[in-house]
């Protein structure tokens, strides 16, 4: 009798629990945005000391450490400057730390500056529109303590370029390697695409050009994407080419093109859509489409692709599709013009918090209309914090004296939406 009573009691308890779970309303935790603490590692490249001088400047609003690769870092500081380092400068700091390397090439006729942002190490990177006649070279450094292995892929308008010795390249810790991209390596009379992929570890990589066409350092596009924006194309004479690569070995890519200017955007006549076969690189002259005006190029593709705009005529400069500003970044004041591009359908706002060499603080903000670009002068000294709540705004710094450099600017901030934590006593 007692066993039956206990059994009936247990059944009633279970039935009550099931009924409660069905009848009681389910509460969904509220979602809120939280900022996750992020640390950032940057590598600042250097040039050949026998041909010129390298100067590295790094800034932040918080302390960071910096120093030559495989050497003791500096004491914690918010402002780091060094001349003529013998190895790349490695920086470890907050998500907003940023810096630039300036390499001045001495020339009997005139000095040429190559300026590039310090950037995180990568596992993949692509450059498009690389001319084998311009004295270009892929320069990569293993900035980590463990060894890495990289593969280099080349693409032309007719397909992949088979070059022996470009697979399973060892990248030893602390070692910088240079791979010349010239006619001896690549028999091509048209621009090609260069891609580096790390099958083990990661590397810091740049494309360097020193030749008759000009002088340039260029960061890679770090991953193929379906929505790309190339900002910071300055006004002026000379040729502008849009170079795109579809590295997919089996699927073609269909790409729509939008040219963004200061007063609006448009689809260039005859170039509204570009179709690309698998494993192909292409180069399209967009000089007439831009009309000598400052511009940004927005691409939307049904397959992940990579893209670069190359400027030639008097000097050479290239800028690849870049990530969004991504939170905030603190840049050293190096002058030039800051270009801001907003590809979204809504107005975006960029905040600028400047601090000059005397410590005077200035706060300002600018609104960027949907599908337009906007320019503002960039300070020549001190620091500038750039920040935005937009997830798509791109920023590029254009320096045109003594030579042309285009610097894509992005931060390392992360904001993510997560459910608010809730107490669940039933889980123990």
Segments (PLM) and residue ranges:
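Hydrophobic, ordered structural segments
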Residues: 84-113, 136-148, 153, 174-213, ...
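Intrinsically disordered, low-complexity Pro/Gly/Ser/Thr-rich segments with frequent PxxP/GP/PP motifs
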Residues: 68-88, 159-193, 265-292, 357-382
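Short acidic, flexible loop segments centered on an aromatic residue
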Residues: 39-43, 57, 140-161, 198-199, ...
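Long, internal scaffold/assembly segments composed of regular secondary structure
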Residues: 221-293, 298-303
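Intrinsically disordered, low-complexity "prion-like" regions in eukaryotic RNA/RNP-associated proteins
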Residues: 59-62
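Exposed beta-strand and adjacent loop surfaces of beta-rich binding modules
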Residues: 135, 147-151, 191, 239, ...
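Hydrophobic alpha-helical membrane segments, chiefly transmembrane helices and signal peptide h-regions
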Residues: 5-25, 194-196, 255, 297-299, ...
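Conserved functional hotspot residues at active sites or interaction interfaces
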Residues: 2-57, 101-141, 202-248, 304-346, ...
């Amino acid at each position: 009798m007692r066993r039956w009573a206990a059994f009936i009691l247990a059944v009633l308890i279970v039935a009550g629990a099931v009924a409660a779970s069905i009848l009681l309303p389910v509460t969904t935790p509220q979602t809120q945005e939280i900022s996750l603490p992020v640390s950032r590692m940057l590598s600042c490249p250097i040039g050949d000391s026998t041909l010129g001088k390298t100067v590295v400047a790094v800034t932040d609003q918080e302390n960071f450490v910096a120093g030559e690769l495989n050497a003791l870092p500096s004491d914690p500081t918010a402002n780091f400057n060094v001349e003529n380092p013998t190895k790349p400068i490695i920086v470890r700091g907050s998500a907003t730390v940023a810096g630039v390397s300036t390499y001045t090439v001495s020339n009997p006729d005139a000095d040429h500056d190559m300026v590039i942002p310090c950037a995180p190490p990568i596992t993949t990177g692509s450059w498009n529109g690389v001319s084998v006649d311009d004295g270009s070279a892929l320069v990569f450094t293993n900035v980590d303590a463990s060894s890495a292995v990289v593969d280099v892929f080349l693409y032309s308008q007719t397909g992949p370029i088979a070059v022996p010795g470009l697979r399973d390249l060892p990248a030893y810790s602390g070692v910088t390697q240079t791979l010349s991209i010239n006619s001896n390596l690549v028999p091509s009379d048209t621009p090609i695409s260069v891609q580096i992929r790390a099958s083990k570890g990661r590397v810091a990589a740049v494309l360097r050009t020193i030749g008759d066409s000009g002088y340039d350092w260029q960061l890679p596009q770090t991953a193929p994407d379906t929505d790309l924006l190339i900002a910071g194309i300055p006004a002026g004479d000379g040729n502008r080419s849009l170079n795109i690569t579809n590295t997919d070995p089996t699927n073609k890519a269909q790409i729509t093109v939008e040219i963004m200017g200061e007063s609006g955007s448009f689809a260039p006549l005859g170039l509204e859509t570009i179709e690309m076969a698998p494993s192909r690189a292409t180069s399209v002259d967009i000089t007439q489409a831009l009309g000598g005006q400052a511009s940004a190029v927005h691409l939307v593709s049904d397959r992940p692709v990579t893209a670069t705009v190359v400027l030639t005529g008097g000097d050479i400069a290239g800028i690849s599709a870049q990530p969004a500003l991504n939170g905030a970044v603190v840049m050293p004041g190096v002058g030039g013009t800051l270009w801001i591009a907003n590809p979204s359908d809504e107005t975006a706002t960029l905040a600028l918090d400047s601090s000059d060499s005397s410590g005077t603080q200035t706060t300002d903000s600018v609104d960027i209309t949907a599908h337009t670009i906007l320019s503002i002068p960039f300070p020549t000294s001190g620091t500038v914090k750039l920040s935005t709540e937009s997830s798509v705004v791109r920023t590029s710094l254009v320096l045109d004296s003594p030579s042309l450099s285009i610097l894509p600017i992005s931060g390392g901030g992360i904001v993510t939406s997560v459910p608010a934590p809730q107490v669940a006593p039933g889980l123990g």
